[in-house]
Amino acid sequence: MSLAQEINRVVAPFEVISEFKPAGDQPTAIAELTERINNGEKDVVLLGATGTGKSATTAWLIEQVQRPTLVMVQNKTLAAQLANEFRELLPNNAVEYFVSYYDYYQPEAYVAQTDTFIEKDSSINEEVERLRHSATNALLTRRDVIVVATVSCIYGLGTPEEYIAGMVTLRKGAEMNRDHLLRKFVSMQYARNDMDFHRGTFRVRGDTVEIIPMYEELAIRIEFFGDEIENIQTLHPLTGEVLRDEEEMYVFPASHYVAGPERMARAIKRIEDELADRLKVLEGQNKLVEAQRLRMRTTYDLEMMQQMGFCNGIENYSVHIDGRNPGTAPHCLIDYFPDDFLLVVDESHVTIPQIGAMYEGDMSRKRNLVDFGFRLPSAMDNRPLKWDEFLERIGQTVYLSATPGKYELGKADGYVQQIIRPTGLIDPEVVVKPTKGQIDDLLGEIRTRTEKNERVLVTTLTKRMAEDLTDYLVGHGVKVEYLHSDVDTLRRVELLRELRMGVFDVLVGINLLREGLDLPEVSLVSILDADKEGFLRSSTSLIQTIGRAARNVSGQVHMYADRITDSMAHAIEETNRRRAIQVQYNTDHGIDPQPLRKKIADITDQLAKEDADTQELLNNNRLAKGGKRGKSAAKGAATVRQDGLAAAPAEDLVGLIEQLTEQMHGAAAELQFEVAARIRDEVKELKRELRQMQSAGHA
């Protein structure tokens, strides 16, 4: 993609900064992967056992090849986990996070059997929307970019050409009319708001214009002297503190779906033409109700687009707005990458089938909407990429998995192996036991493990069996919890943390104990009904489940079965193969396996500590003032915003700290942990300032 030639890209090297060096199989894997990529191999597979550090290997690979990278992950949770790991390993590079910005999404649909139309309903997470804009902004302004994304990256996004065409360049000393800039911001879908200044808005104070771009947390101040830009500064929107002076900055549109007036006029004409043609077809088929429904709905949308430049569901007209021909592929995040980008597919055995399934799932719903007059046929062009379209857009690809699928193994010339763990830990021993008396045997094994302060995972085939087993174990005095599909994301994280901390000893689940579960305290994984062939007991599922016990020095897996199925045989054979390699390596190098000591901490812990510290500081401040509370939190915060941090008295800082602490807890309650962490950092800074005032005797 040669779009950003007019933009001065930041060119900085990818650099891994870590106290750890590649160990175990990592040096060999990094060297072989680098060689294959540099030799131009299109598809490369890394078969990496659980816990061998595939993420770190990927970071070191990116450092070696020095190319922008898209990392595709199967779900939002793992994407966030991986993005955080990359941010720690590559702190000086742009590591971005691109997932669906819907907290809740109900697409519009029509159920013909019951004549039920379901309106589109959604809830957008503004922080995730900012991160999506941050990803496209980074891709267009620098080369040292890693974007960790879910399959939402193959869904339609506005064209990079229009996104860049809508951009405004701010350069110190350049000639620019202030009013022209304001009109430009409005055309980029920013809203003027002089009272409530937040992301996606701008405000004007005489010759000074301030804006918070959609992809930023900081504000930009542009100071004019006549028709010349005199100063450009980056500042903190809350405190007004100037952080740095800028020579040149780019401001990108507030929406990825930006269309200039000429493009919108052309789109409206095309929509009107398509509507006329479609109405003839429906009326010719005597579908008068459908024709009337389509006429009313589309006419209303056209009026909104003419008057407001936007309408609900505007994405359904994207083929006309983009100026594409019917049936052609939509633009997506991949189009924002330069031509030489590297694709990394994490847990490829799950992610690759996901990519292939997206298009058909979307089409089956859209066909009903078109057939029954709720949408024009062009709505079917607002879609994810088809499999072959996806393949056309990607270049060299690295597939990561402990259990690579047939597709990726068929594409690659063999695979790179990463079996040895840096800690020396080996794959667990697999023991097959008869199903007769399995529950009593399981109970005995649980008691043995709990005496050693170790944890147990039990996986069953059905919800009923999981519930009954949990009740049975509770009746026998076992501290046990049941993890099922109805448990929300936050509660799931809490359950896993409580298991590690020893609040309970046994976790029972169905299909929730596979990829991405990192529990070093678990020494036993028990698989009930291991000989029942099917998705949950396929060789891939079994190997992934076995991997959950690979983080413990004394890890074991017990399979309860009356016969050994082909899937079991393959899983056991592969585990024993890896185990033999690991044992031999440890023997040859005199390595004694070390238990994995992973810190049991999360953002909720940090917030609790921060909260206690804040309370102590504020109480001390009030005691120093003879118990007086001073101004309200809101008034104090407002004074700090108006006068700036340096000029604020201590009681106003107290107000701001109280207000931010409340916002921090609100963000955590809504699972916006990144927002909570940022507010926590602001609170820390304000408390440092307040402590300095107290020690100087000004508080």
Curated annotation (Swiss-Prot):
A cellular component term from Gene Ontology for this protein is: cytoplasm
Q: Which GO terms describe its molecular function?
A: ATP binding; ATP hydrolysis activity; DNA binding; excinuclease ABC activity; helicase activity
Compartments (UniProt record)? Cytoplasm
| Residue ranges annotated for the Helicase C-terminal domain, each copy included | 438-604
Q: Which residues bind ATP?
A: 48-55
Keywords from UniProt, A to Z, are: ATP-binding, Cytoplasm, DNA damage, DNA excision, DNA repair, Excision nuclease, Helicase, Hydrolase, Nucleotide-binding, SOS response
- Which Pfam family is an annotated match for this chain, by its short name? ResIII
Q: Main role?
A: The UvrABC repair system catalyzes the recognition and processing of DNA lesions. A damage recognition complex composed of 2 UvrA and 2 UvrB subunits scans DNA for abnormalities. Upon binding of the UvrA(2)B(2) complex to a putative damaged site, the DNA wraps around one UvrB monomer. DNA wrap is dependent on ATP binding by UvrB and probably causes local melting of the DNA helix, facilitating insertion of UvrB beta-hairpin between the DNA strands. Then UvrB probes one DNA strand for the presence of a lesion.
Protein name, please?
A: UvrABC system protein B
- UniProt organism field: Paenarthrobacter aurescens (strain TC1)
Q: What lineage does UniProt assign to this protein's organism?
A: Bacteria, Bacillati, Actinomycetota, Actinomycetes, Micrococcales
Record gene name: uvrB
